[in-house]
Amino acid sequence: MIEALKRTFRSLCGAALAAALFGLAATVPAPAADKVSVVAAENIYGDIAAQIGGAHVAVTSLISNPSQDPHLFEASPSAVRAIADARIVVLNGADYDPWIEKLIKSAPNPQRAVVSAAAVMGRKPGDNPHLWYDPATLPRVAEAIASVLTAADSAHAADYAANLNALTGALKRIDVRVAELRARYKGVPVTASEPVFGLMAQAIGLAMRNERFQLAMMNDTEPTAHDLAEIERDLKEKRVKALIYNAQVSELM
């Protein structure tokens, strides 16, 4: 069962991220003058914008390396310029990428539209910020992106609508897979180093343990002695069937 869960985790990551996992660019190219310029904080949202916008958009994703810690990201001068000039900026929000919110505020642009996944999903700082693992997030963010693209470039509204329809149709395959996994794994006890996969685990119906420990790790605070002892006991006594580990963290304990 553990190996099956590991394979499931990898396949869901691949499905959700689609074609978005590429190297981190050192500089940001200038968009073509006849295209709608879109800047995404993370490439998963940049990929959504590119699929909806097609040939009519120039998309720049500032974080494209899955091992990059968004909390430690420092924007290059070209990235700062790209944000200042962008017609559309897409971000995660919920304190996952606060650096881009600061850059947006420092460069006011009345023609710029901002799409925040957290705002779309009604999430706030303190909530689990890994919103793309919620199967409901990407379709709703896609709708929001299509809406602002249509407002910025109404001449290609039909193309944006068609691309949105195709994308949301493709994303329904994830819903089907999640339903299959829920039927098989609902109630299976698991734990994690951080709540990165928490929203997907919730959708699948996994019984997530040690959530206070995970929050402490995510917030870079010391877990309590009780919470530390509890996760150690769960692992040593094999009370959980899988450990979901955040590769961005060098140590679990």
What is each model feature region?
Residues 13-26:
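Bacterial N-terminal signal peptides
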Residues 2, 31-253:
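Extracytoplasmic metal-acquisition and chelation regions
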Residues 1-9:
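N-terminal secretory signal peptides that target proteins for export/translocation
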Residues 11-14, 134:
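Polar helix-capping/helix-linker motif
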